[in-house]
Amino acid sequence: GVDKEGCRKLLGGCTIDDDCCPHLGCNKKYWHCGWDGTF
């Protein structure tokens, strides 16, 4: 994910990883942001 205004929080809707906030990635199964394993 990326640190930008309007980034999606955990379980927020997404289509790509960069829709999500830092440390989150887009889960293509559920189309929401989930933790990507980074700190």
From Swiss-Prot:
GO biological process terms, semicolon-separated: envenomation resulting in negative regulation of voltage-gated sodium channel activity in another organism
Origin: domain of life: Eukaryota
Main location: secreted
Subcellular location: Secreted
Annotated GO CC locations: extracellular space
Modified residue annotations for Phenylalanine amide: F39
Disulfide bonds: C7-C21, C14-C26, C20-C33
Annotated InterPro entries: Huwentoxin-1
Tissue expression summary: Expressed by the venom gland.
Protein role: Inhibits mammalian voltage-gated sodium channel subtypes Nav1.5/SCN5A and Nav1.8/SCN10A by shifting the voltage dependence of channel activation to more depolarized potentials and by blocking the inward component of the sodium current. In vivo, this toxin causes erect, elevated tail, initial partial ataxia, followed by recovery over approximately 1 hour after injection and the progressive development of shaking. Although paralysis subsides, the body tremors never cease and persist until the end of the experiment.
Record's comment describing the protein's domains: The presence of a 'disulfide through disulfide knot' structurally defines this protein as a knottin.
Family statement drawn from the similarity comment of this UniProt entry: Belongs to the neurotoxin 10 (Hwtx-1) family. 47 subfamily.
Protein's name in the database: Beta-theraphotoxin-Cm2a
Lineage: Eukaryota, Metazoa, Ecdysozoa, Arthropoda, Chelicerata
